[in-house]
Amino acid sequence: IPPFLHEWHQQLPPQHQNYIHLNGIIPNQKLIKVYAKSKICLCSSRYEGSHIASAEALCAGASVVGPRLTPQLNCLQWYVSHDSGTLSPDDSPESLSGALLEEIRAWDSGKRNPEEISRYWCSLLHAENSCKRIIAAYEAAQGGKTGL
């Protein structure tokens, strides 16, 4: 973890320090527990293909917060489409912070269900399920069909 992040964390009010944990690099085998415990995956990136970390978080039952208008990262609109996250209306730090607060309120008011988030996204994103959908699409195309 860069020293400036530790300094930033130490300057936070004590009540906020308890809610923000700087974990550094986390081994793959521990990621699911971290995602589930954190509840929210904040995606501040603008330039990633499908943001694998967000997909992993969804499968672990966490929700996603990110910028709305990002053509290079348009998967986020899909990731929040099933009561599983919030997008910021504008691409700015203030707007992203507001979306994060909105998502925290959604969890606090019971609008997010980690089991439902995980069940839904695992059914779509796990490798076996994805392969079945690709094969079905291929077979449908071979037969002249247009749907799955």
Model regions and ranges:
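Nucleotide-activated donor-binding/catalytic signature segment of Leloir-type glycosyltransferases, i.e.
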Residues: L5-I25
